[in-house]
Amino acid sequence: MPKLEMMLLVLLILPLCYIDAVGPPPPWNMEDEIIEHWQKLHCHEISDLTPWILCSPEPLCGGKGCCAQEVCDCSGPVCTCPPCL
């Protein structure tokens, strides 16, 4: 096999071995990054003891949450929060 063909074969096989060993890169989720950035700019924690967040673009109570549990309305299929001040 000529050197050029051998070199091309090695260059084609080498990345496959690297991907198999390391695994594919995790999918990039732009939505999570946007929400995280928005929360850093606009959200204010009520206290250090509670995980609730005062205002957030996501309609959830708690977790990545949208508002304090006391003012969150979860009567429907989706939780809603009062508008941020």
Swiss-Prot record:
It is found in: Secreted. Residues 1-21 form the signal peptide. Keywords: Disulfide bond, Neurotoxin, Secreted, Signal, Toxin. GO terms for cellular component: extracellular region. The keyword Protein biosynthesis does not apply. The keyword rRNA-binding does not apply. Residues 22-40 form a propeptide. Expressed by the venom duct. GO terms for molecular function: toxin activity. Contains 5 disulfide bonds. Belongs to the conotoxin D superfamily. The cysteine framework is XXVIII (C-C-C-CC-C-C-C-C-C). Probable neurotoxin. This is Conotoxin Im28.1. It comes from Conus imperialis (Imperial cone). The lineage of its organism: Eukaryota, Metazoa, Spiralia, Lophotrochozoa, Mollusca.
